[in-house]
Structure formats: C-alpha cells, structure tokens
Amino acid sequence: MAATTLDFLTQQLQLADQLLAGRKAMFEPQDLPGRYGRVVQALDRVLATLNCPAALAGGWAVWRHGYVGRVTQDIDIVLPAVRIDEFLRVAAVAGFDVLTVPAGIWPKVVHKDTGVQVDILPEGERPGTRMRPAPTTIPHPLQLGAMPGKLRYVSLPALMELKLAAARARDEGDIVELLRANPSEVATIRTHVKGVHADYAAALANLIQRAQEQDET
C-alpha cells in the first residue's frame, strides 16, 4: 500500500477526477487511466502469453459496477489455481516483482514502473478470515466473466458473491452501494446468490433492506 503523502493524495484526487469524467466510456479494465491502465496493459501481456483467463475483482470492479465513489490503490485479480505458478514466472520477466509472502498468504506482485500492487485471488481458496472463513471457495475466473488472454471485470452477480464471501465491513458497505446503484439487477443478484449458498442469500436479504432504508432517508 502506498504511503499517504501530499503527492500521493494529489494523484488520488486527480485519478478520481479522471474516473468521474470518463465514467460513461470506461467499460473495460483496458480503459482505466494513468498508472492503473499501464498495469492492466502489462497484465494483459502476461495473460496473452499464457492464454490465461483472469477476472478483475476488488475495488475496481466495485467502481465499474456503479459505486463511483470507490477508488482503490491495488488491483485484485482472480486466477485459475493451476496457472498461478506460471503466471508468476512470466510476470517476473514482464515488468513485475514477485513479492515474498508468509505461508498461507495469497500471492502478490508489484508493477515495477508504477508501484501498483496486484493481489492474486486463487481459484479454490477460501475467502473470509481465519476466525470466520467463508462457506464457499473462489470460483474459476471463467465462471466470473473472464476470458483467456485478456483481463475482464467480474460480473455484478459474481462480484456480490465474492463480497458476501469476504464479509468484512467494507465489503458489506460496497454491497449496499452496489445495490443502490443497480436496483434493476437486484432480482438477478438474488437468484445468483441463492444458488451459491443459503448463508449468502440471508446476508444479502439484510443488505437489501439496508440499501432500501438508505434510499428512503
């Protein structure tokens, strides 16, 4: 995570302005401005070399699906479990540093030119916390809306699934804002989540109520 300096805050404000101005034209990860766009280009080169699918999740997916106030520092991508080792090998010679992480921590790389960190969410791993693990694991990126060789955003229902699995306060806040931004998609989201796990369906029902209460105030 970048240090909070005046220069960093200025860059973040400029980024927020760019994102707001280009919101209606930035439909794909490749459309992101500035250093984040350069990281996506570098990731695409790695993915194209491997013909590997990857789904962009996390804060950038939240922004893409309508929570326009959400600006994040890192990039989160879902990769197939069997492709992670070769992804890291190619990334290491394609403009990224592979970080050394403790056992049990998911892989991370840093884009050398921009300093942007890329957090890898491995298919089959269990989100949540050690004290409160999710009842499901991370799906294959192709199930989330990915395609081989190029980074794609996770679909809105899949993003909700991942957020419900993580279940942090920030994730719940993101879900509420996404529900408020996408009222016409609530039924589709509800159907998807119900098919994943009953716990998620119950949690989503509570968050839908929270979103409705906020809209009424």
Language-model features: where?
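Compositionally biased terminal segments of proteins
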Residues: A2-T217
